[in-house]
Design a protein with these regions (language model features):
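Second-shell loop/turn segments in exported
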Residues: 99-109, 209-214, 283-284
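Sec/Tat signal peptide C-region and signal peptidase I cleavage site
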Residues: 21-26
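Bacterial N-terminal signal peptides that target proteins for export
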Residues: 1-10
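Sequence contexts marking disulfide-bonded cysteines in secreted/extracellular proteins
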Residues: 52-61, 147-149, 237-239, 257-259, ...
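Bacterial N-terminal signal peptides
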Residues: 9-19
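Metalloprotease/metallohydrolase-associated module, dominated by Zn2+-dependent proteases
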Residues: 248-307
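Propeptide-to-catalytic entry region of secreted or membrane-anchored zinc metalloproteases
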Residues: 27-168, 174-177
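Metzincin-family zinc-dependent endopeptidase catalytic domain
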Residues: 111-257, 261
Length: 307
């Protein structure tokens, strides 16, 4: 289940000024994501994925990208270094499930959660980030379970369940509408103590789930990457600054499956299809670059210093 992963080769006022004060609605998110969320739908709640959306995190606009760069550069200039911290992040797992006509859906076994933490630690080995399961709670709420992708339900769920988000990674499992596999908010999106922070996952994308080919636990790896400040590898397409990381080749659009040799931009390097921040199958992705590691470290130092 775990893999060997390799590394290739803030001010709050500004943060709040560059983003909205609350998340967009599901419809708004779809409109913002001009790179195309993947079109994934499920045959059934426990069926294989046919078509729909891989990740519900919209690409940030050019103004937000520039504002974040300015703030991160200011942190580095003030401190004189690129941070290289070892940070162990406590994980608070919130399992939301439903019971309908005597049938329980989404109350995942503890072994899936334990294995998910192992997958995260394998994926982030060498990045300076590690993860420890601090608690698991379980909540039966049919409305939250199926409505967690709507802004009002997400807000209710997180306000009720979140645990000290400045010092913990809160992960929620549910069954988002529209076949969404997961989402998170960038570190600059809100104050580090905001209940909005955390990761929301389709419950059966965890290791042991049935959402093949996205059921080895790397939806969580991908969304935690966003939580720590990474953009998609195809952010900006073939145009500078791309994903704001110098050692990930430009990529015109998201890759699916595992298309070896794919090369969609004229600049050097084939598409980074093995990178955790693309949209390929879980079995295909296995790496972060050293530039992405520096990006996560500086984003956390700038926007999540209490983590």
């Amino acid at each position: 289940m775990s893999k060997r992963f390799t590394l290739s080769g803030a001010i709050l006022a500004l943060a709040l000024a560059t983003v909205s004060t609350g998340p967009a609605s599901a419809a708004d998110l779809s409109m913002q994501a001009n790179d195309g969320f993947q079109d994934i739908h499920f045959l059934s709640p426990d069926g294989k994925i046919q078509r729909g959306k891989r990740c519900a995190v919209p690409n940030p606009g050019a103004d937000e990208v520039a504002a974040v760069k300015k703030q991160v550069d200011a942190w580095i200039a003030e401190n004189g270094i690129i941070p290289d911290a070892n940070i162990n992040i406590p994980v608070r797992f919130h399992v939301v499930y439903k019971v309908s006509r005597g049938v329980t859906t989404g109350n995942i076994p503890q072994s899936w959660i334990t294995n998910q933490i192992s997958v995260l630690n394998a994926a982030y080995a060498g990045t300076g980030f590690s993860f420890t399961l601090a608690s698991t709670d379980r909540t039966q709420n049919n409305t939250w379970f199926t409505g967690c992708y709507t802004t009002s339900r997400e807000k209710q769920m997180k306000q009720a369940l979140t645990i000290d988000p400045a010092h913990n990674l809160n992960i929620y499992t549910c069954s988002p509408s529209g076949g969404i596999l997961g989402w998170a908010y960038f570190p600059n999106s809100y104050a580090e103590s905001s209940y909005w922070h955390g990761v929301v996952l389709l419950y059966n994308s965890l290791p042991g789930g049935s959402a093949a080919p996205y059921n080895l636990g790397d939806t969580a790896t991908h969304e935690v990457g966003h939580y720590l400040g990474l953009y998609h590898t195809f952010q900006g397409g073939c145009t500078s600054p791309g994903d704001s990381v110098s050692d990930t080749p430009y990529e015109a659009s998201a890759a699916f499956g595992c298309p070896a040799g794919r090369d969609t931009c004229s600049s050097a390097g084939q598409d980074p299809i093995y990178n955790f921040m693309d949209y390929t199958d879980d079995a295909c992705m296995y790496q972060f670059t050293s530039g992405q590691v520096s990006r996560m470290q500086t984003m956390v130092a700038t926007y999540k210093p209490s983590l």
